[in-house]
């Protein structure tokens, strides 16, 4: 599958520090675009990602797979301290749910 810029995961938010809208893209954490409007921030970043994809392909690099195109197993191994584990088990027991149900409710 050849990913295109519009297939990636974008987010636009207001930055009080910058006094402008900032667009970011999950698959390229080092890229962002700042503009006066949400629309300009997003469209500018999509154009930037398109340029980056061209550059990556020309240099033989493999672009990241868009998050929406990845497959997920539904399983996730979680490591925690013994104390955290004890607290989670106790809280789950107090709520009358399994540890798995408790942790899923927190996500």
Could you describe each region identified by the protein language model?
Residues 29-40:
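A short, exposed loop/beta-hairpin motif centered on an aromatic-Gly-Thr core
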Residues 43:
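Aromatic- and charge-enriched surface segment that lines or borders ligand/interaction sites
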Residues 12-29:
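Short aromatic-glycine-(Arg/Gly/Cys) micro-motifs in beta-strand/loop hairpins
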Residues 3-4, 11-17, 35:
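Short, positively charged
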Residues 27-31, 74-76:
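Short amphipathic alpha-helical segments
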């Amino acid at each position: 599958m050849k990913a295109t810029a519009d297939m990636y995961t974008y987010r636009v938010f207001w930055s009080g520090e910058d006094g402008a809208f900032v667009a970011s893209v999950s698959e390229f954490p080092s890229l962002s675009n700042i503009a006066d409007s949400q629309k300009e921030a997003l469209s500018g970043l999509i154009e930037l990602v398109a340029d980056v994809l061209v550059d990556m392909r020309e240099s033989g690099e493999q672009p990241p797979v868009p998050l929406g195109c990845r497959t997920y197993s539904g399983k996730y191994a979680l490591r925690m301290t013994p104390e955290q584990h004890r607290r989670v088990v106790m809280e789950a027991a107090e709520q009358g749910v399994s540890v798995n149900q408790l942790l899923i409710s927190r996500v």
